Amino acid sequence: MQQFTGFLLTRQWRDTANGLELVYWLSSGDGPLRLVFTNQQAVCFIDHETGLDSAPASRIQATRKPVDLVSLNGGKVDALYFRQQRDLLRFSDLAEEQGILLYESDIKANDRFLMERFVTAPLAVQGDARRRNGFTELINPRVKPVDYNPALSYLSLDIETDGIDGEILSIAFSGQGHEEILMQGDAELWQTDLPITWLGDEKLLLQRFLQRFAELDPDLILGWNLVNFDLDYLERRCRHHRVAYTLGRGGETARILQPQNPGQPRIASIPGRVALDGIDNLRAAFWSFESFALGHVAHELLGRKKLIESTDQKIDEIRRLYREDR
């Protein structure tokens, strides 16, 4: 058995034919780790005295067992175990319709697994390790909490587009001493000392970007309005060209979850990587500005301005610079 110390980056659950599977990605001094836990169960709790025999929810297969736990009012509870997370979700919806009280039915299996082991983010891992392409994988290892301060790798990402629904003209990323720009165009027509790689069309641009991101392999993706604009736009253009959006580690597909209701944010689900948005993080730290436009915030904090300000002519100026000053 091998031992590792890592820091939790992302967690996912997925229903399989063999039951619920939990996947955790960690950053460690030995490189990225992928922990897979198979044959797990989704769990919620119900009052011991509540019967289910005649309820429609009883048609969903679950195993009911008494446990040594009580509700907040001191009453005994039973645990309900489901082979798949979707079964618990369906059961919870039916129970609510029928006025049946459940406890902790909203806690996802991947979160409960960590909570029951008192793990927050740093953890010690012990198990049989297998080396994969760019990461180490452990199946059903032992885990426990530990003190660990990681040195996370990062890249800052920014794209420029031809309007609000046109092609991506350039993708730039930098971090930890690395700077790189991918741009549509012909190298023979443009002379520059900047670290630019020229690509013939948008599809080639996207494919090279995903290739380079996998090679640079950051733990964190940084940006301004990162999820709502850059990552969402990249996903849409990949879909347009039928290019797999493999921004996750191990070649896994990233997804930008769209809001279900007005005012909700988009959420980036990127296996093995964390997207950190500058706007969200400043707001979380209780910073307040007249405008959260990048140019305004940069001027307020750093005394610097963007080359292209957020004006009504911004798109026209981007197009002009792309034509004349690449």
Task: Label each residue range with its predicted role.
Residues 1-280, 284-326:
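The two-metal-ion catalytic cores of nucleic-acid processing enzymes
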